[in-house]
Amino acid sequence: MGIWVTGDTHGDFQRFTTRNYPQLKGMDRNDCMIIAGDFGGVWAGEQTDGRKLDWLEDKPFTTLFVCGNHENFGLLSAYPEREWHGGRVHVVRPHVLHLMRGQIFEIGGLTWFTMGGAASHDIQDGILDPAAPNFERRYWTMRRMNAMFRVLGHSWWPEEMPSEAEYAEAEANLERAGWQVNCILTHCAPSGILPQIELHYRPDPLTDFLETVRQRCRFSSWFLGHYHTNRIIDGRFVIQWGQISKVELM
């Protein structure tokens, strides 16, 4: 069994071709390809997304992902939920699984704590509500201005950030594990790491929660995406984007 981790795909899975990544040859269903958020394959509904998801299902490996901030959370939450390797998942396809927030999985002999989500940083000019009476006028005005905005329920969902119940479940599961896991998988970074990524990133409730995890939890590696860079910070925080990295198993 092997485990590989990559960063944001945003619905583009071409990195998972043997032409782009020859190491895919010889993989099987016991091998796992993990996407560190902004999966983007569940976005416009099965009629639009289905072909790409079926293509991914046909790959020889099992695809696992945590949510990022650019996901259609309404559609994602509608997929069947079940237990898998000790934690809860949404089954997008039999071998395409969403690792839900606050869970601890055992994969490849390693324990993995998962906490997807992030606060969008491309909404400086606001969130438009399609139900507002002046929506269409505001939408086209902002488009002409090249404004940084998104549309509620179409390109932005408040569920990009965890709920209080998800925070509570995460903490309870870490308590049961004695605040010790092998790996942590998130989309965004803990607050204490943000200045080392880029100075303009500001803490928020999720990054603050992850900072608590960083300080309290014993772990070997922390994998994340979100920042569109490939970097390793402090020897343990592996930021992924287009790169695919193999995880060393114990």
Language model feature labels by segment:
Residues 108-200:
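Active-site-proximal loop/helix segment associated with metal-binding centers of metalloenzymes
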Residues 1-4, 103-114, 183, 234-238:
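Beta-strand-turn-beta hairpins that frame and shape the catalytic cleft
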Residues 3-5, 33-36, 183-187, 223:
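Structural motif
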